[in-house]
Swiss-Prot record:
Region (PPI): 328-357
Name used for this protein in its record: CBL-interacting serine/threonine-protein kinase 15
PROSITE patterns: NAF, PROTEIN_KINASE_ATP, PROTEIN_KINASE_DOM, PROTEIN_KINASE_ST
Subunit structure: Interacts with CBL1/SCaBP5, CBL4/SOS3, ABI1 and ABI2.
Organism: Arabidopsis thaliana (Mouse-ear cress)
Function: CIPK serine-threonine protein kinases interact with CBL proteins. Binding of a CBL protein to the regulatory NAF domain of CIPK protein lead to the activation of the kinase in a calcium-dependent manner.
Catalytic activity: L-seryl-[protein] + ATP = O-phospho-L-seryl-[protein] + ADP + H(+); L-threonyl-[protein] + ATP = O-phospho-L-threonyl-[protein] + ADP + H(+)
Amino acid sequence: MEKKGSVLMLRYEVGKFLGQGTFAKVYHARHLKTGDSVAIKVIDKERILKVGMTEQIKREISAMRLLRHPNIVELHEVMATKSKIYFVMEHVKGGELFNKVSTGKLREDVARKYFQQLVRAVDFCHSRGVCHRDLKPENLLLDEHGNLKISDFGLSALSDSRRQDGLLHTTCGTPAYVAPEVISRNGYDGFKADVWSCGVILFVLLAGYLPFRDSNLMELYKKIGKAEVKFPNWLAPGAKRLLKRILDPNPNTRVSTEKIMKSSWFRKGLQEEVKESVEEETEVDAEAEGNASAEKEKKRCINLNAFEIISLSTGFDLSGLFEKGEEKEEMRFTSNREASEITEKLVEIGKDLKMKVRKKEHEWRVKMSAEATVVEAEVFEIAPSYHMVVLKKSGGDTAEYKRVMKESIRPALIDFVLAWH
């Protein structure tokens, strides 16, 4: 794989070495059929298994697969051999944003442009239940047109990564960019921690240096905990006001991405751009506003874990990366309907088919039994108002299961389905 000119999986010609991290090397490559330029991250499977990094890799795949946005590095496909995992990603040619600020501060209008793209992308991530947890200039790339691209979701957490208190409990991120509550180790909201990191990045772009600096790590943590910031005198009043709201040590009063995007400093010079990929993804939020039972439903509906989400996604069957499993007779679809609506519809379909229908109270499972086959359906939450529904044969004849699905159940669900997988 390290040799320039070698061919990977009969699909990609490997090019020059681009860089490496602790567990991965990145190469430029070219798709043999299309000629498209890509970046391939090569991960040593044995190394990550030895150090217990399996879940982190699964999270990165899940996060990147869920996110399709102009300002997020796109994951095209994942491949694997016995010893390696390959992430085939969009090749971002403009280098790191870090290189732009390594020589000093940026002009206010330039810094604002990058910050606008960053916050819009982070807000999009959060709407999909994903927090990045390691936002910093080194993880922000620039394309050939100077547009920002967020990369490196290795530390990302989906909403299912939380404990019962709804908080994350692992200290992630680079020290200078982490929020006070992350350092405290008492659990934190990853979405609010991302906002803090965005504030640190904005400060660096405008000032040319970090807001919290100390050679002693404990002293650095103290400064972060107290949000001790000295603003340079050249900072515009509007930028200073916004930074104070973002770099609030109290996560409960810290400004949200939504409010940041409404601030006058943020909106200055902002042009509303038509982004088809964003609009397409945003459809899943069309019915995000629920009734009074929505909060209860959110608690009861089972969240897919990160690996399950990606494994269920079209074109990304990763079951063989780390474990082997038996093939199951099942079909899946995504929906933007509430879990209660989906289960009610499934009950209705079962009754129309004269099947024996059983639904447990407070659970989003429906069992439809006929003489020849048994179909079980379960609803999983991927993000708020975005669900994955799994319909599987739990008994009876496989041919009859497929017939019932094709002729009756699938057509009856047409208004509930975003996509079959």
